C-alpha cells in the first residue's frame, strides 16, 4: 500500500493563505496536544532516467563503505523499498529530485516515457523537481507529460490514453520571458494540519543543456535567488518546515559509501551553504553521486544535504520532527541515511508487472542484430578527450552527411549515454544497445562554416565559468578532422593546426560540417554553430549510427589520435 500524508495539495501563492488559515484552525486530538512535535519521514530519489528494469553496466551497482559492490536499482525494487520505508513511519512524503525521464532506458523511451510516469504515479510521488532532461524534447512535450494526452505524432503507444503525472512538477527558477512562472515553484503538503513546503530548482544553464529551440520563450534564472525568494514567500504564509529539491549536485573527492561526505567544493555545495536558512533539508541530483552531508546554513545551523546515486539505486531518507507550536523543523533531532535499493527483498509485484510489460513490448525491436564489433566501443576518454565510441559516432554522422557535402563531423560527448559492448563469440550488438548509446533521437544537420567559425567552435570546448573555473567539453571529431590542442594556453587560443582531410584550414575558407541539432542550436554553449548557413537535414543520429555500424561490420575500435595534445 502506498502511504501518503493526510492531505496533499499543490497550490499557487494566491490560494496558499486561505489553505493555511483553514489548516491552522483544525483542532488537535488530546494525544497530539501532548506530543509537542510531529515526526515526518522525507524520502527522495533522483535521476531515475526511465530505468524500469535494473540498470546495466556500472549503474547496476552501489559501492559500500567497505569498498564492496552490491547490485542495486530497478523500479520494482525501488518501489518495494519505498513501501518498506514509508511503512516504518506514521507520516511520510516522497519526492523525486528530477530527471525522471530523458536519456531513458529503451523500455521507457520507446513509449515516450509514458511507462515511467505511470510508475511514478503508482509509487505515490508527492512532488518532483524538474530536471534538465525533462525538457529534452522541449517544453510542449514536458507539458504533455505533466497534464496528459497522446503524443501528437505517435499517439498513445503504451495504452489507449495517457493521463500524465498526478503529482506536481516544480521549478522555482523556470519562467517565461515575461517573468511569469512556467510551472509551480513549490507545493505544500499537510501533516496533522502542519504545512510542509517543498521548493525545487533546476540548473540555471538548462538552456545550454537541451535543444534551445525546444525551450524558446523560457528563461532559467539564478537558483539561489529563486530559493531565497520562494522560501520567504512560504515563510510569509506560515510555512516553516521547508525542503529543497535542487537539481544540481557535486562530485565528491572520494566515494566511501552511500553515507560518506567527501564533498569539499562545487556550485551545489556553495548553493547549499548560502541558501536561505528557512530551508531545512536539501536533496540534490544531476551528478549521479552518493553522499550524506550536514552543512551549516547561513545562520550556522546544521542542515542535511544529500544525494542518492541514480537510476533508482538509492532512496535518501531524512527523519524530521516539527514543532507543533512554531511549525518549524527541530534541526538537532533530524537524522538522515541513504538506503541502498538491493535485490534481497521481494520486488513490488505491481511495478514489476508494469516493467515486464514495457520490456516485453520493446524487446522485439531492441533484440534486432545491428552489427558485430571486434572490440568494445567505450566512452572512456584519453588524454585528448577522445573516446572510441565518440569517434565512431562522429564517423557515422560524417558518412550520413556526406551526400550533402559534409567534409567532417563533430558530436558532443553528452549525447553518448552507454558503452557499446560486444556480445557473444561474434561480438554482436543489438538495436537496443545502439539506442542506449544514442537515445536522444537528434536530427543531423550539415552546415557551411568558415575556417574562422570552425576554430571558434573548437575554442568553445573550453568555457570559463563565473567562479573562475573552466568547463571542458571535447567534441568527438570524425577521422577527416585533426587539430592540436594546448590546455595550458590562454582560453580562446588553445586550438591550432586544424586540418580537414590533411589540408590546412584557412580562416576565410568555407567547409561543410555535420552536427546534431543540439549543437546546431548552440547547445552546450557552442554558439558558433548557430550560423546555420546552407543548412540541410541529414536524417537522425541513431539511424546514422546503426546504418554505419551495419555497413562497416565488423567494426574495429578506431584509434584516438585525431586530436594532438601539446603542452
Predicted feature descriptions by range:
Residues 34-343, 384, 388-399, 409, ...:
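Acidic, metal/ion-coordinating pockets
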Residues 329-429:
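Hard-cation-handling environments
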Residues 46-66, 370-380, 437-440, 522-530:
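Acidic/histidine-rich, surface-exposed loop or edge segments in extracytoplasmic proteins
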Residues 7-21:
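Sec-dependent N-terminal signal peptides
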Residues 21-36:
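C-terminal region of N-terminal signal peptides and the immediate post-cleavage residues
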Residues 2, 75-76, 301, 351-355:
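Zymogen propeptides/activation segments of proteases
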Residues 1-7:
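N-terminal secretory signal peptides that target proteins for export/translocation
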Residues 38-41, 51, 159-173, 177-186, ...:
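Feature captures C-terminal
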